[in-house]
Amino acid sequence: AGFRRVAFIIKHEIEKTFRETIGARMEKFFHVAYVYQELDCLPEGFTVPEGRVKPWGTNHAILVARDAVHEPFAVINADDFYGAEAFRTIAEYLRGLDGASGRYCMVAYKLSRTLSENGTVSRGVCSVNAAGDLTGMVEHTQIERTAAGIVDHGANGDEPLAEDTPVSMNLFGFTPDYFAHSEAFFRSFLQESAGNLKAECYIPSMVNKLIADGTASVRVLRSPAQWFGVTYKEDKPLLVANLKKMIRAGIYPEYLWR
């Protein structure tokens, strides 16, 4: 779908099992790199606070990959199903950048295509201007479909959300200049969150700041695809059924990595 290189961001402790079960199969089709996100992967001058066990978050995960990535790249959650068309769309945009920097992108999904039948979900609701660029993302943490439609159970009561509200599922496209911005943002995060052993540094927070500062623009690419993931264990049967349906339809082979 447009990509031939992949960098897996993992922990050292799972490397052997990961390479044997996933990496070995992927290496037949991609140039594969392994990058390690560990607590002590910190900028110079910082140390891991005593008692910290929680990973530093998605922005930190991307930052540790800086030595493995030297061209425009896409970022995904490893446990989400985005659909092949989303990858083709973002790959086409990245190929068209022709060395430009500060021109990022993301693939937005219709909110109605990202819900769970088994409980509330957290989604980054996107604001988009007339030019098609992102102006900001706001995390809504209690979204579900009700008899009255889709609502977010916020602190100030239920807020209705339109079916076609664009939301981020963490499918972003960046150019390598992102890493310098990412490190600066992460340094500020470490200083501001000192003493908070559970604070995390997220990609959407970083992107929002770059937009607000005028440092970068983020083009919003639209996907009509159905997103799949397992927010609740009860979501898995539906995910499996839909994957089997796509295999029967010839969209995917039964054995993807053979």
Regions found by a protein language model. Name each.
Residues 18-22, 90, 182, 239:
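Hydrophobic packing residues within well-ordered alpha-helices of enzyme cores
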Residues 30, 84-172:
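Conserved core of the sugar-phosphate nucleotidyltransferase
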Residues 130, 137-258:
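Conserved alpha/beta core of the MobA/IspD/sugar-nucleotide pyrophosphorylase nucleotidyltransferase superfamily
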